[in-house]
């Protein structure tokens, strides 16, 4: 089968207006990070599989292939672990505020509608144990969405320690933990009831309520505190309250106490961003204080934020905030011995471009096809208008 006209599953081309919008968004987001004092970092698209082979990435769907020496390599499925590798192996001084943007690749199932190639931008705050690091990530996420004019968005908070505390207390097998995770993610009331009946504990009331513990932050957190006396869970709830109090002046904040991230490396506050015009989250992040341990014996506190720039481009398009690309208003056809005059004229005339055609006739045909309103001919004898759209006469 000849596939020279096909694209791999989950990939797509971007043309003209969309490609320009995606480029502009990436520029705008990176500029925002820089203004907040973040230092840019770039890592290779190709990494050795060992970077992603820890338990933290057990669910990652990797594009694997062998290099010229027979070593197993992958296309990076996220940016966080490669940045952890850099920080752990280069001896850079902590604490650090890093930013990035680039492509990530995940081998999703066919017909799932997910893009296997995504453009992602984000930040990593490494070496700061303070909750101010989480607050900074969330404020930056909100600031970026406002700068991009994303309408009606909402930030949702969770806490990885809640799910971890429940599963640790229940002492679940690996299979049982996977089943429980799916029940929580699907908010299955019936399934959770059966699970609690089969796995009774001091957290029964809290677990039974988990599928319903999402919504307005203040009300849900107050309700949750009345359902348990467990110190670990109460500590997590108080951290969430602190975050809500700090950032709620900037955006609509909700909570989901059953929020479980796909990557297992999160240890504390986790967050996502949603909007009325988007089916899935386009912003995610949280705290992961043990991530660097797989590269070095020393651990370091870290918080990260990631933005799906492809989703944000789509959101901007749906919201009608993508500005139209400025159209060419003048095509400059020239004789080769008049290139200097033509180039000078093009530099001085906004929204103009040079014609590469050999004849004025071809230049005029091109202008009509692409709705360019005027064509001039530059020669040693001077400048002559050879085409003017009737509406502009």
From Swiss-Prot:
GO biological process, one term: L-histidine biosynthetic process
GO molecular function: catalytic activity, acting on a protein; histidine-tRNA ligase activity; transferase activity
A Gene Ontology term for the protein's cellular component: cytoplasm
Oligomer and partners: Heteromultimer composed of HisG and HisZ subunits.
Recorded family membership: Belongs to the class-II aminoacyl-tRNA synthetase family. HisZ subfamily.
Summary of the function given for this chain in its UniProt record: Required for the first step of histidine biosynthesis. May allow the feedback regulation of ATP phosphoribosyltransferase activity by histidine.
Protein's name in the database: ATP phosphoribosyltransferase regulatory subunit
Organism this protein belongs to: Listeria monocytogenes serovar 1/2a (strain ATCC BAA-679 / EGD-e)
GN (gene name): hisZ
